[in-house]
């Protein structure tokens, strides 16, 4: 039992608490009214990236999946995409946690944050341009290149903000102090 169980317990608690934080951040930000209902701010990746940069790709990916609950409901279940197609939000957000977790071992937190989003960005573009027209032809007329660029532009602005936050958190080792360890 001992150390391994204690470490696993801390990891579960860390991922669960960050998952909750990410969903609270998502609830607060996706509720902000915007001119286009399917283009809303979403800062849930703050939690994904905290876990990815502190605990690596596996836990970052799990946290990415957990923080996608609110965006999945907002844009999938209650949005244009429905629960089946909207379900792809979950692995896409997880992908950012996995990628940033790997990159965070070699790069500064800000760069790992920004580069960690690149695979999700590409997959999101493909989702809008290939998956939505095929599975949701009634929605396809609204998913134009301009719409996709607006969604991705908004996401890059969010990730830029989150990159600054991650630099500050890692530089001051805020999470390390909370967890009782220093890097």
Predicted regions and their residues:
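Loop-helix junctions at membrane interfaces
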Residues: 1-183
């Amino acid at each position: 039992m001992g150390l391994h169980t204690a470490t696993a317990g801390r990891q579960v608690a860390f991922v669960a608490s960050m998952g909750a934080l990410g969903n609270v951040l998502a609830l607060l930000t996706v509720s902000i009214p915007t001119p286009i209902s399917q283009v809303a701010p979403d800062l849930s990746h703050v939690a994904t990236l905290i876990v990815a940069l502190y605990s690596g790709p596996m836990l970052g990916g799990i946290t990415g999946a957990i923080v996608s609950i609110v965006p999945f409901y907002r844009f999938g279940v209650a949005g244009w995409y429905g629960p089946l197609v909207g379900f792809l939000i979950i692995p896409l957000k997880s992908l950012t946690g996995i990628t940033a977790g790997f990159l965070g071992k070699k790069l500064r937190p800000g760069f790992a944050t920004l580069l960690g989003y690149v695979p999700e960005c590409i997959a999101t573009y493909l989702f809008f341009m290939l998956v939505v027209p095929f599975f949701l032809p009634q929605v396809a007329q609204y998913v134009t290149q301009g719409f996709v660029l607006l969604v991705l532009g908004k996401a890059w602005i969010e990730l830029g903000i989150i990159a600054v936050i991650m630099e500050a958190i890692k530089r001051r080792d805020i999470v390390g102090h909370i967890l009782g360890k220093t890097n």
